[in-house]
Each structure stands twice: as structure tokens, then as C-alpha cells.
């Protein structure tokens, strides 16, 4: 049976680790041995009760200071590159590289002659030179590339060994959703889930709340309360009575069950969604969504 060695740097509650958790959970239930190399404190930690999973922790997180982020990134690449060689003499090993970031272990895998599979969640070609370089390296190192949308795959020069597999939702999440169109309409509650990155539209969402006092607005941020407070202070935001901002949540199903409409306000001039897991979650909950007109996210929505 195959032995899966999975590398994912930043373990939080965003889309890519959620999808990875679902994949690994199915593999673990089928009896596969999985070694997971990732940071602490996110959704992937919910897999630790499986006896056939071994977790190797690496220290990695983002910083508001780009120089510190680059230093942390470089350090974790060296660490994971060297760590990967512990499986040098293991047979039937597959290196699963989740997102573009773990380039160090991908390189180590190719040096050792292991089968390297990338699960590509980003769209590097609408980002900066750094991500474009990582995407170029991915196309050289990967035996297989899994994309999450046709839009995303269309930017790759390489076509061989590229598969499009749209993201899905775990059954235990879907089972907690309780769609009720009538009560949802009556609530007049607007929901958005995302990060504090400006291109994700948090300021625009807050402005909508200020202008539309007849609606209730909820913003669920994939970040700590401390960083939310800093963001509010930095941008001199006045939190109006009809707006509630929540920090990182382990379970977002209750928010969908109380919502009437879900927004994705990503600025397509600065950032194009490759998929949009929150939109899939919202539609599964029977909720209408408003999304950008470009990118993988637009493949899911019909006017």
C-alpha cells in the first residue's frame, strides 16, 4: 500500500488545508499510512486521532513584515528539504505537495526519485513574480498536477499530467447545514468569510454594512482577534451596530444556517479566485451568492 508523505506549510482554517483534511481523512479511513508535515493550530490538527497518521510539526506563519515572512519561508524550505530525506529508502512513497509553497520537499522528492504530486490551489499567474517562479518550478518537478478549476489550469504551459478536480465538501459538514429558504429570506442577514487582505474586500463589506442599516452583516475572518483589532485601528474603522466581526472559527456551518446571502468581494483587478470554497459551502446551504465575474469561482455560479 502507498505511503503518503504530505507537505502543507501554513495550517489554518482557510480553503486549502480544509480540502487537504478531507482528502487525508478518506485516505486514513482506507488504511493508508500518512505522514503530515505542517504547522500547528489549524484544521489539520483534527486528524491527529488517527493511529495511521504521524504529524511532524514545522514552524511557519505569515508576518506583516515581508522580510520576516521571507526569512521564515526560507528557513522552513531548508528544514522540510532535509526532513524529506528520512524517506529516502522507503518504497511505495508518494510526496503530496499541497499548494505551491513547499518547493523544498518537492525538490527533495525528485532527487530521491519519489513520485511527486502537486495539489495546486493558487493562480500564480495573476500574482507576483515570486508565485510565478514557484509555478514554473512546480511544472518542472511534479509528476502530476491537480488543479481546482479549468480557469486555473488554463494558465499552465504544461498540459501533460494535469488534472482538474473541483473541490468538494465533507459529508459531516454538509449534514450540519439546514437550508430553509423562507426563514433565510426573512432574516436579512449578509455573510462574508475571508481574510483581512484588502483585495478580499473587508473594507468594502464594512462600508456596505454602514450604508445598509436595514440588514445585519457578519464578517468571519480567518485570523486572530488581535490582528482584527489591529486592522480596525489601522484603518480607523467604526464598527456599526448592524455589523459583527468574528475571528477564526473551527466550524462555520452555524453562520451559513443563519445567513440570507453570502458575498465574495474579491477585487478581480488585484486577485482572481481559483475556486472559492466558501461559495460552494453557501450554495450547498441553499443560499444565494454574489461573486466576481472572473476566475474559477465564476464557473460555479449561473446568473
Regions found by a protein language model. Give the residues of each.
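A conserved mid-protein helix/loop that constitutes part of the nucleotide-sugar donor-binding site
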Residues: 14-25, 188, 195-211, 277
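Short N-terminal targeting/anchoring amphipathic segment
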Residues: 5, 73, 84-102, 117
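Acidic donor-binding loop of glycosyltransferase active sites
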Residues: 257-272, 287-288
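Glycosyltransferase donor-sugar binding loop
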Residues: 36-43, 169, 193, 217-231
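Nucleotide-activated donor-binding/catalytic signature segment of Leloir-type glycosyltransferases, i.e.
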Residues: 230-249
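Carbohydrate-associated surface elements
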Residues: 151, 168
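An aromatic- and histidine-rich active-site surface loop
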Residues: 43-44, 76-80, 94-112, 127-128
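Short hydrophobic beta-strand element within catalytic cores of glycosyltransferases
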Residues: 264, 279, 284, 288-291, ...
Amino acid at each position: 500500500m502507498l505511503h503518503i508523505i504530505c507537505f502543507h506549510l501554513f495550517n489554518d482554517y482557510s480553503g486549502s488545508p480544509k480540502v487537504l483534511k478531507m482528502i487525508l481523512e478518506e485516505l486514513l479511513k482506507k488504511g493508508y499510512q500518512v505522514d503530515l508535515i505542517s504547522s500547528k493550530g489549524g484544521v489539520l490538527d483534527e486528524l491527529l486521532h488517527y493511529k495511521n497518521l504521524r504529524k511532524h510539526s514545522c514552524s511557519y506563519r505569515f508576518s506583516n513584515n515581508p522580510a520576516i515572512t521571507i526569512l521564515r519561508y526560507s528557513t522552513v524550505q531548508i528544514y522540510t528539504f532535509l526532513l524529506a530525506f528520512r524517506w529516502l529508502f522507503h518504497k511505495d512513497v508518494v510526496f503530496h505537495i499541497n499548494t505551491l509553497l513547499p518547493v523544498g520537499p518537492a525538490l527533495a522528492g525528485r532527487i530521491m526519485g519519489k513520485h511527486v504530486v502537486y495539489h495546486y490551489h493558487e493562480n500564480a499567474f495573476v500574482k507576483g513574480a515570486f508565485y510565478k517562479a514557484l509555478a514554473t518550478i512546480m511544472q518542472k518537478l511534479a509528476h502530476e498536477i491537480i488543479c481546482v478549476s479549468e480557469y486555473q489550469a488554463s494558465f499552465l504551459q504544461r498540459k501533460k499530467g494535469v488534472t482538474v478536480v473541483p473541490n468538494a465538501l465533507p459529508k459531516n459538514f454538509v449534514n450540519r447545514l439546514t437550508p430553509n429558504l423562507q426563514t433565510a429570506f426573512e432574516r436579512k442577514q449578509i455573510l462574508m468569510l475571508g481574510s483581512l487582505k484588502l483585495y478580499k474586500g473587508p473594507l468594502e463589506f464594512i462600508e456596505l454594512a454602514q450604508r445598509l442599516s436595514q440588514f445585519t452583516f457578519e464578517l468571519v475572518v480567518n485570523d486572530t482577534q488581535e490582528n482584527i483589532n489591529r486592522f480596525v485601528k489601522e484603518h480607523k474603522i467604526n464598527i456599526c451596530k448592524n455589523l459583527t466581526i468574528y475571528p477564526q472559527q473551527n466550524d462555520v456551518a452555524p453562520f451559513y444556517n443563519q445567513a440570507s446571502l453570502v458575498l465574495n468581494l474579491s477585487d478581480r483587478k488585484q486577485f482572481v479566485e481559483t475556486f472559492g470554497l466558501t461559495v460552494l459551502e453557501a450554495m450547498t446551504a441553499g443560499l444565494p451568492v454574489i461573486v466576481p465575474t472572473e476566475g474559477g469561482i465564476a464557473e460555479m455560479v449561473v446568473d
